[in-house]
Amino acid sequence: MTRHFLRDDDLTPEEQAEVLALAAALKKDPFSRRPLEGPRGVAVIFEKNSTRTRFSFEMGIAQLGGHAVVVDGRSTQLGREETLEDTGAVLSRYVDAIVWRTFAQERLTAMASGASVPIVNALSDEFHPCQVLADLQTLIERKGSLKGLRLAYFGDGANNMAHSLMLGGVTAGVDVTIAAPRGFEPHPMFIAAAETRAHQTGATVAVIDDPLRAADGADVLVTDTWTSMGQENDGLDRVRPFRPFQVNADLLGRADSEAVVLHCLPAHRGHEITDEVIDGPRSAVWDEAENRLHAQKALLVWLLERS
């Protein structure tokens, strides 16, 4: 049976732990696994602009012995002159996996229904699951264990990072609090999914509008841009509600004395996070960015071995 990774809860807690353990091993010995030797091909499709995702996937596929066939979604006929199901079926005859950065989650689901090779969500409007695998790998490196950690996210609770942190975090046994202004809460459907998974792992998930309370005693502070792709023209009216949710020295001072700060990047310095924090001793942002490479390699190896 072909396995896909379209959202964070596509992996069980045990499977997620396997991927993270493999990511750690591949970080120590980058060329120890070569499942794409040949080279075999992986389609890497970008309908949204990308820096970290493109570099990390292209290099990761090369280190696994494969060849990345990178295409701009605008130069293909994805979903225009044939169904996404048909495209998935056709691409499966050419490549061994498909990595896709797209818009609506439904597009991934549609292609996966026709594909016979693994599909990886490299970012959608609803989820950013590869990033959260890298976040979890970083926290294991910094904290040693994930279970029982208190993670607080500050900013737009309706964006893909908030959704993925909820689902991926509680899968790992992390207690997740989303601190967001009123009107910017996570989608109720994804809150419910996170609560279901949290019940299985013993973790907790909460959504509040008080950033100070969320920061109190937290082990991990996470933020993301206040303006996601496609919202750049919304102006000051969009930014204003988020200002109390900035991750700055005062907010960090309320967290645990050994708290770690994460940001998936790109960072809008002076908006969601200050220079003092992102460049400070408790920032793990650069390790987090590097771990995209290792976590995604581990994910591809894991999926290919099971499909």
UniProtKB/Swiss-Prot annotation:
<keyword id="KW-0055">Arginine biosynthesis</keyword>
<protein>
    <recommendedName>
        <fullName>Ornithine carbamoyltransferase</fullName>
        <ecNumber>2.1.3.3</ecNumber>
    </recommendedName>
</protein>
<keyword id="KW-0028">Amino-acid biosynthesis</keyword>
<dbReference type="InterPro" id="IPR002292">
    <property type="entry name" value="Orn/put_carbamltrans"/>
</dbReference>
<dbReference type="GO" id="GO:0042450">
    <property type="term" value="P:arginine biosynthetic process via ornithine"/>
</dbReference>
<dbReference type="InterPro" id="IPR036901">
    <property type="entry name" value="Asp/Orn_carbamoylTrfase_sf"/>
</dbReference>
<dbReference type="GO" id="GO:0004585">
    <property type="term" value="F:ornithine carbamoyltransferase activity"/>
</dbReference>
<dbReference type="GO" id="GO:0019240">
    <property type="term" value="P:citrulline biosynthetic process"/>
</dbReference>
<keyword id="KW-0808">Transferase</keyword>
<dbReference type="Pfam" id="PF02729">
    <property type="entry name" value="OTCace_N"/>
</dbReference>
<dbReference type="GO" id="GO:0006526">
    <property type="term" value="P:L-arginine biosynthetic process"/>
</dbReference>
<comment type="similarity">
    <text>Belongs to the aspartate/ornithine carbamoyltransferase superfamily. OTCase family.</text>
</comment>
<feature type="binding site">
    <location>
        <position position="224"/>
    </location>
    <ligand>
        <name>L-ornithine</name>
    </ligand>
</feature>
<dbReference type="GO" id="GO:0016597">
    <property type="term" value="F:amino acid binding"/>
</dbReference>
<dbReference type="InterPro" id="IPR006131">
    <property type="entry name" value="Asp_carbamoyltransf_Asp/Orn-bd"/>
</dbReference>
<comment type="pathway">
    <text>Amino-acid biosynthesis; L-arginine biosynthesis; L-arginine from L-ornithine and carbamoyl phosphate: step 1/3.</text>
</comment>
<feature type="binding site">
    <location>
        <begin position="50"/>
        <end position="53"/>
    </location>
    <ligand>
        <name>carbamoyl phosphate</name>
    </ligand>
</feature>
<feature type="binding site">
    <location>
        <position position="101"/>
    </location>
    <ligand>
        <name>carbamoyl phosphate</name>
    </ligand>
</feature>
<dbReference type="InterPro" id="IPR024904">
    <property type="entry name" value="OTCase_ArgI"/>
</dbReference>
<dbReference type="Pfam" id="PF00185">
    <property type="entry name" value="OTCace"/>
</dbReference>
<dbReference type="GO" id="GO:0005737">
    <property type="term" value="C:cytoplasm"/>
</dbReference>
<comment type="function">
    <text>Reversibly catalyzes the transfer of the carbamoyl group from carbamoyl phosphate (CP) to the N(epsilon) atom of ornithine (ORN) to produce L-citrulline.</text>
</comment>
<keyword id="KW-0963">Cytoplasm</keyword>
<feature type="binding site">
    <location>
        <position position="160"/>
    </location>
    <ligand>
        <name>L-ornithine</name>
    </ligand>
</feature>
<dbReference type="InterPro" id="IPR006130">
    <property type="entry name" value="Asp/Orn_carbamoylTrfase"/>
</dbReference>
<feature type="binding site">
    <location>
        <position position="77"/>
    </location>
    <ligand>
        <name>carbamoyl phosphate</name>
    </ligand>
</feature>
<feature type="binding site">
    <location>
        <begin position="128"/>
        <end position="131"/>
    </location>
    <ligand>
        <name>carbamoyl phosphate</name>
    </ligand>
</feature>
<feature type="binding site">
    <location>
        <begin position="228"/>
        <end position="229"/>
    </location>
    <ligand>
        <name>L-ornithine</name>
    </ligand>
</feature>
<feature type="binding site">
    <location>
        <position position="292"/>
    </location>
    <ligand>
        <name>carbamoyl phosphate</name>
    </ligand>
</feature>
<dbReference type="InterPro" id="IPR006132">
    <property type="entry name" value="Asp/Orn_carbamoyltranf_P-bd"/>
</dbReference>
<feature type="binding site">
    <location>
        <begin position="264"/>
        <end position="265"/>
    </location>
    <ligand>
        <name>carbamoyl phosphate</name>
    </ligand>
</feature>
